[in-house]
Amino acid sequence: MSETKKTRKLRPLPLAFTRWLFSVHRRLFKDADRNYENNRSLEAPDMGFIYGQAVCPQFTLGKKKMAGVGCEIAATYNALRLLGKDASFAEILRDYEKAGYVMRGFVQGDMGTDPFSIGDFLKAHGTDCVSYTNYDALASVMAEYKNSREVYILSFWNRGTVFGGLHTVAAYTSPDDGKLHVFNRYNNSTKEAVFSSLGDYVPKNRFVVGYRLLAP
């Protein structure tokens, strides 16, 4: 989903409940191939990174458009590109739909994609990763490797209640400055956002799950 600039304090939900909440809304999408044909026609060969999900081609996820629900797909696409891998956005989106990782509330895709499915998706497509549901453990790893080129995917609540949805981004640490560089901070972003650390960007009480992608 997209992130807005209005945030409030949120008491963390129990991990088991959060996983259940996402899993019960996952659905297979029978029109994935039809979406793929449309999405492929929108994807330029030189599309590059997605800096904001509302300022890129408006691909279709389930029955919804990219701007409101496409952050997990954008994060996966950006992260794979950060690893130097060839990545087709249309193919990634189709494969998430076919795997049943896209969520449905009232219509297919209106709840985005289950963030806990990202690790399974990456591994099924040849990219190893380490998943973190413990915020402190992830923050420690990111601090330890801040001066290395490391690629991450981060999911977190983006408003004061679960009903405001969550946001998922790709990020990397740079040996040039030791900072965290984030793609798609807001859905209308046009460049990377830079933070000193995980804690500078994502508060502990909003964290859902994170992934450290391992280079081939």
Regions found by a protein language model. Name each.
Residues 81, 86, 91-215:
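Conserved active-site-adjacent core of cysteine acyl-enzyme catalytic domains
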Residues 2-107:
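Active-site-adjacent structural segments surrounding the nucleophilic cysteine of cysteine proteases
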